[in-house]
């Protein structure tokens, strides 16, 4: 398959279980919320959240896969 590519573009292919990914994201959300609400940690939520605006864009594409797991291709733009 010929796929257009961009110079200096990182591509990552990964298999994931949708339910496992959902559990891990929820766990991450709880951990970040806990860090943001505990004053003793000194965790700067504003700095953490603002850094997301400067993060490079990532395009996620589903790849054809006949198996149980879905396959993703992530292209960093």
Curated annotation (Swiss-Prot):
What domain of life is recorded for the organism? Viruses
This chain's protein is named Uncharacterized 8.6 kDa protein
